[in-house]
């Protein structure tokens, strides 16, 4: 079994690439979401692959010897744990919760008492129109929520209640001693048996496997502040993972959908307006797209290339401060590459009228070659 092949990454993949690959596969194969035959075993396999490849020392050992450290060692169960995976006491759910958060993962280890659920992060792409109006958008979030079967008790309904952990006597922590330069000091660590809970489940819930929570995809409403821009993030309180000590928060990262015609520059919007030479010289009217719809704008006679015209109050609301930005029309004078005979005559007449030098008719390549050799 090739760990790199399991995760679908190359042997030179970075830590971020390995993490991203595992994240996608774990969400797809998680037992709470995928009931297909073999999904649980595949979930365990990709979890073990990630547990090895995400650890620098374990990955180096695997790259050198083709196996994880300790695999197949005497006294070890080469096929122990969930899904027939190697490693003594290996639990793929622990690997999952360390990445996605959970009381048995990042949120609970090292804490005493009820643990708060972990914070979650996601992203949403919005339009300029949505950012300007401060609309409410919806995102779908994968959250750990209370198991509906056991209601978070972790015990199968009707089963035997949890018992006090014999290792820590229900305290959730174990004491020890450590030798330091200041002498021997007393230490306290999370109980390795009950993982800080103080109790051991006797009859685990058949749905959540004794964890008290299951993974669910849920819609979350997010109110956009007016004028929000790319790179900002919004905190939605209580929409992270659920935990016995309260819910974590959800952080939504903002990405902007490119507008087909307008460019944003802080609170201002820029419209590159391409106009012809005649319109620039004589003036005229053009249609300018705004977030409220097309607006007719007058082009003054003698408009120069790069000249700016400001439509006040037609930009974005200032995110921090009062007022609204402007929509700036940036004129770009387009010089035609090809002219018909009538247009050429008109421009030559104009040039003579204003005293501009009129260039001679452009000769083709064969005409120049003919002159070079004395041909008419």
From Swiss-Prot:
Q: Where are the zinc fingers (CR-type)?
A: 134-217
Q: InterPro entries from the xrefs?
A: DnaJ, DnaJ_C, DnaJ_domain, DnaJ_domain_CS, HSP40/DnaJ_pept-bd, HSP_DnaJ_Cys-rich_dom, HSP_DnaJ_Cys-rich_dom_sf, J_dom_sf
Q: Where is the J domain?
A: 2-66
Pfam families in the cross-refs? DnaJ, DnaJ_C, DnaJ_CXXCXGXG
Q: Which PROSITE patterns match?
A: DNAJ_1 (PS00636), DNAJ_2 (PS50076), ZF_CR (PS51188)
Q: Identify the GO cellular component terms for this protein.
A: cytoplasm
Query: In which residues is Zn(2+) 2 bound?
Result: 165, 168, 191, 194
Q: What is the annotated localization of this protein?
A: Cytoplasm
Q: Which GO terms describe its biological process?
A: chaperone cofactor-dependent protein refolding; DNA replication; protein refolding; response to heat
Entry annotated with the keyword Secreted: no
* Entry-linked CDD domains: DnaJ (cd06257), DnaJ_C (cd10747), DnaJ_zf (cd10719)
- Cofactors per UniProt? Zn(2+)
Q: Enumerate the UniProt keywords alphabetically.
A: Chaperone, Cytoplasm, DNA replication, Metal-binding, Repeat, Stress response, Zinc, Zinc-finger
Highest taxon above the source species: Bacteria
Assembly and interactions? Homodimer.
- Family designation: Belongs to the DnaJ family.
Domain comment as written in the entry? The J domain is necessary and sufficient to stimulate DnaK ATPase activity. Zinc center 1 plays an important role in the autonomous, DnaK-independent chaperone activity of DnaJ. Zinc center 2 is essential for interaction with DnaK and for DnaJ activity.
Q: What does this protein do?
A: Participates actively in the response to hyperosmotic and heat shock by preventing the aggregation of stress-denatured proteins and by disaggregating proteins, also in an autonomous, DnaK-independent fashion. Unfolded proteins bind initially to DnaJ; upon interaction with the DnaJ-bound protein, DnaK hydrolyzes its bound ATP, resulting in the formation of a stable complex. GrpE releases ADP from DnaK; ATP binding to DnaK triggers the release of the substrate protein, thus completing the reaction cycle.
Q: What is this protein called?
A: Chaperone protein DnaJ
